[in-house]
């Protein structure tokens, strides 16, 4: 099968990026050595829909070293980096993704990696799993199981599982402690502001930053905005999270209220229509909107285009929309993921943990192929605590940190037994 990428000649630039993250992902380096010897994925086809940048490319390399036949596509039209795709193809992996893909090109890539009949699926947002269930049902028996990286993808899986429409086991990677406690909070917090700052080149200190959603990602974005000197306002639909935001020192109000006072808006919800036409009309002249959730539906860009009396590029990756009231609203990266469409994503050291969870979860599926539950309605699987702890212990060891252990007497005191 011939790969479909933008320009194979870009592989040298991509290789430099991948080499940089290799040096900063020691957990994956250890797994690469182990997988190279044990070949846990020998004879298996792995299909991935991922944000195709240097760190995910390194994960693909690790799985390939483990014996897998790799088929890779993007999970977002703007997050694929063409030089990274070229580097992977140069290494002999199969890639079907281009930066700036049209909707047709994007779903063509999804179809390409499904049509090979994968045994393991690694998904980011749920498009791969959804399509195999709706358009390629004859290939479902080939699938041992899959891994889902995101909150949005897990919500889609939960809906499918509840309706008994999910027909193979899925590992809920996003729910692992070593994933959401670190990547979602610290990774998103840093990478979102990296994307915003490098794109706008504006100061954050003294501005009103509105963060929509106070899950782990929203907490990270809010924390880093506060650290940059912003006055942070949180909007929420969950009363518990709203109280948590208040007690963390942030203002909480409805989006309708926040729209009138915000300078920078960041959506981190995974839901659609978080910022709508009504909100745009209330915003200040020069308000900046961006999305750090998943799909490009959180900020209603399509509605903004319809209501604008004109729009034009304001700067690379920023579009200016002129409203009939005379105000201008700025949208970063077309409302797609600001940390990937306008940046390089989460820091390598953070993704080292998340991708170690991914790799070990994929291995878990293969190791437990004959015993894992395949009953409809019971297809969702937590990452085993042993895997979570293994990743945490490896990371601490890499940092040169040792921690205490319970004595037998302490263990008996806490948990009983003899």
What are these regions (language model features)?
Residues 5-7, 16, 29, 36-37, ...:
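Ligand-binding pocket scaffold of soluble enzyme catalytic domains
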Residues 10-25, 41-45, 53, 168-206, ...:
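Adenosine-phosphate binding glycine-rich loop
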Residues 74, 121-124, 137-152, 271, ...:
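ADP-ribose/adenylate-binding Rossmann-like module
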Residues 48-56, 76-80, 126-128, 216:
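Gly/Ser/Thr-rich loops at beta-strand to alpha-helix junctions
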Residues 30-33, 64, 115, 129-130, ...:
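Rossmann-fold NAD(P) dinucleotide-binding segment
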